[in-house]
């Protein structure tokens, strides 16, 4: 039981509170240490996000097509063209003999009696509008088939039974969803039905057993009489046919006639066909340096932003007189005062960090070590990228835009090899642990600049994860997390100790109060004795 200072006149609770404030000083140190570790963990993770952005920018110029972008120009109204990265700059010729078309069959005449048109949503037997005065009930229960052929020429056949209590739309839906690759519909303007392939191209029987591509079979009376669809009226689908000439390779055209679509690729150029030509028409292929230039500049800008931020973190002053605020200290400050304090307390958390210093040095070496290439460029300076002469910018890259554009125009493949070259597979196939120093050196010299930087980034990001973790790791799985857990244990132990110390103070003051009560009682008895 806790006894206040009734006998002694001492404010026991206030006295113990002041004593405990002194005892809690080490606990505040532990709490501040934990907060500092959490801030440092978060700062490392922010750095990893920064490095990931740079890695993404580097990845954007990894593909050959990202640096060797081609474009084609032509005055033709019959096609457009898109060359791939390997197509040589120059003039080519194309003749379009035939475009790919869909097979289709259309009613030979109107299917209604003329005064009133058929409704596709009403039941067939609720209408008396059929051409030639047909009695629709005569066709109830008839079964017909439709056969089409897939891309291999195999037949696909489906059967359909006429139910006059249902609508035309119901029949169309059954046919369209039967997996035949056709679409049937009614055109009210012309009062005709059309059935057509959903894809362009010639889809014929592999064995040549049928000249038609949408074949009607079974009892075709409904198709022939009511819908006016006759097999002989089919317009068969066709494949596209083009002739292509690369005058450097041959004056004889290459004929392509097996494309079922109007996208035809020949000579590394993909043509989108919209019509036929009367003869050969010319297209010119050239390098689009703008797209490649922008990707390189995006990487340079991201690289500069990254090293600027890293150098800022490494040089931030550390204010050791501004430890993290405890909750009690924060309550004593205004919101603005607390913000200013936190700014100084968080400053310099990564000052002179060895991992980040090593990364900056390694990336600079990655960029300036020559690359073994087969092209004309083996150094980044040869394509117009250099380090700023201002030492205060610490490795900031500067670009001679004219020189970079000229390099991309003259030899984009060589620029790609400089940036993205890979080491010989005979070297990279050797397990990392078994490589000699000479082999490691050769791999490095054959690896392009971007590959080197991405390797350095990956290594540092992995080191940061080992130290500061990420959202997928528990605190036991990274260094700072284990340090935080250790501080938590110390805090728990110290809090238990504080409880014991506070209880001891209360016990001591309680005994003092009890002794004072006894002394007061004895004094009162003596005083009463002398009075009497």
UniProtKB/Swiss-Prot annotation:
Keyword set includes Transmembrane: no
Entry keyword annotation includes Secreted: yes
UniProt subcellular location: Secreted; Bacterial flagellum
Domain of life the protein comes from: Bacteria
Principal location listed in the UniProt entry: secreted
Membrane-spanning segments: none
Keywords carried by this UniProt record: Bacterial flagellum, Coiled coil, Secreted
An example Gene Ontology CC term for this record: extracellular region
InterPro entries in UniProt: FliD, FliD_C, FliD_N
One GO BP annotation of this record: cell adhesion
Residues in the signal sequence: none
Coiled-coil regions listed: 507-528
Described function: Required for the morphogenesis and for the elongation of the flagellar filament by facilitating polymerization of the flagellin monomers at the tip of growing filament. Forms a capping structure, which prevents flagellin subunits (transported through the central channel of the flagellum) from leaking out without polymerization at the distal end.
Quaternary data: Homopentamer.
Family: Belongs to the FliD family.
Protein name: Flagellar hook-associated protein 2
Organism: Halalkalibacterium halodurans (strain ATCC BAA-125 / DSM 18197 / FERM 7344 / JCM 9153 / C-125) (Bacillus halodurans)
